[in-house]
């Protein structure tokens, strides 16, 4: 049976099928350039990350599951997505993913990685993780066809929104994130960070 340890020693390139067949471990891995790369090591998520993830998930889930939502769908945490990066299979695992039922109908959802391009992914910075590295990941998401990427920085108490056709914009304090692409959704950074208990 394949294991992460054996693969790291052999430097064997993984196919998406081999990667998805690996046994689950305590560490979350992503498939990057044929290698199983730890998502957070050595910067394990801490309390702020753990607090922010369910709060942001709940905001997105409440919005996209409301009867009046123009783009009904579902929000997910830690759901692998089948993408392409630099012409190679790429399987990232965003902290949060929102996908509409138009892109992935309910009846097409199975206990498998996300096979459609979601509208939004959210990544929360962990201690020791460089903002630059996450910005590059945001660019990779956009290049793969995901139209919106949010990078949440607990230290700066900011949310930076990345767009495919405009420069990124950072929101702090009472600056509300409102986007015609996600109609009806309103996120105020200071409210999110206050709810998470981040001073």
Give a label for each model feature.
Residues 1-199:
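Gly/Pro/Ser/Thr-rich low-complexity, intrinsically disordered segments predominantly at protein N-termini
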């Amino acid at each position: 049976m394949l294991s992460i340890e054996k693969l790291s020693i052999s430097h064997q390139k993984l196919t998406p099928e081999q990667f998805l067949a690996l046994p689950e471990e305590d560490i979350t891995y992503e498939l990057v350039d044929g290698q199983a790369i730890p998502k957070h090591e050595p910067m394990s998520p801490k309390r702020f990350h753990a607090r922010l993830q369910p709060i942001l998930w709940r905001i997105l889930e409440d919005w996209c599951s409301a009867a009046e939502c123009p783009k009904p769908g579902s929000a997910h945490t830690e759901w692998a997505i089948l993408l392409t990066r630099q012409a190679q299979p790429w399987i990232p695992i965003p902290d949060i993913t929102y996908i509409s039922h138009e892109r992935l109908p309910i009846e097409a959802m199975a206990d498998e990685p996300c096979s459609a391009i979601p509208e939004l992914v959210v990544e929360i910075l962990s201690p020791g993780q460089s903002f630059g590295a996450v910005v590059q990941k945001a660019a990779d998401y956009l290049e793969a066809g995901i139209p919106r990427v949010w990078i949440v920085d607990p230290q700066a108490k900011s949310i930076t929104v990345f767009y495919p056709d405009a420069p990124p914009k950072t929101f702090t304090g009472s600056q509300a994130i409102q986007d015609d692409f996600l109609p009806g959704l309103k996120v105020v950074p200071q409210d999110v960070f206050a709810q998470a208990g981040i001073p």
